[in-house]
Amino acid sequence: MSKSEQISHMTDVMAKFVGYTGKVLPDDVTAKLEDLHKKETSKLADVIFTTMIENQRLAKELDRPSCQDTGVIQFLVECGTNFPLIGELEALLREAVIKATVDSPLRHNSVETFDEYNTGKNVGKGTPTVFWEIIPNSDQCSIYTYMAGGGCSLPGKAMVLMPGAGYEGVTRFVLDVMTSYGLNACPPLLVGVGVATSVETAALLSKKALMRPIGSHNENERAASLEKMLEDGINKIGLGPQGMSGNTSVMGVNIENTARHPSTIGVAVNVGCWSHRKGHIVFDKDLNYTITSHSGVNF
């Protein structure tokens, strides 16, 4: 393919993939919702879970977005330095969002700040957001897609703790956020926690944590133990599906971390709602692609 044909091909695939993720949940989210439904003992929660699952069935059957809020589109990119379209990637992802907005369709969710007008295309200044990670000597491009809806974005919080607060302080911060804001974020939630030096590094890590598969664990045993502790603690709050009470509050807690300054503990929380619309696609140098988040999908 020529360069222009490559760009057109990848744009088309990404537009279709973005639209698809708004209609069909990833395999791990679907499986977790079904598992939580089976374990639920509250009659009201059972009805809500049944409605959630029926909603997803109809979204796929009718080829419509599963939630009216299709969010602001975000991409987390891990791109090799030898990938043929690395220089064109941001522009083509922008075009893919414009195309998906019409074809899927997606709700118009890009409002220019201060000027306060909706662009009508789901693109604007800095939108879609692209978070980059460059991989040396690789010719592949891994792209996580995410629909950041209003409800699941509202609980997002970050702060820097004094080191004396320790990991008890991290735990307290996460639980405070969940008890104060989790109710209205459409639970059961996937909770992403970032621990680093400052607010921006912790916040980005908490977003990356939401891309991890449900049921995965931090490679550090202490961090993995804290994931389980937080999951158990938040579940005991009993938010239940849609915040209407029940046995569970979350689908899981994922922690991502970096080394930190000895004088600070930066911590951030991001959450994904029950309709956690993430996707993961990997392109090789010939633009063949593999979708890992949704089985049996090809465009």
Task: Write out the residue ranges for each language-model feature.
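Non-transmembrane, aqueous-exposed alpha-helical and coiled segments at domain scale
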Residues: 1-299
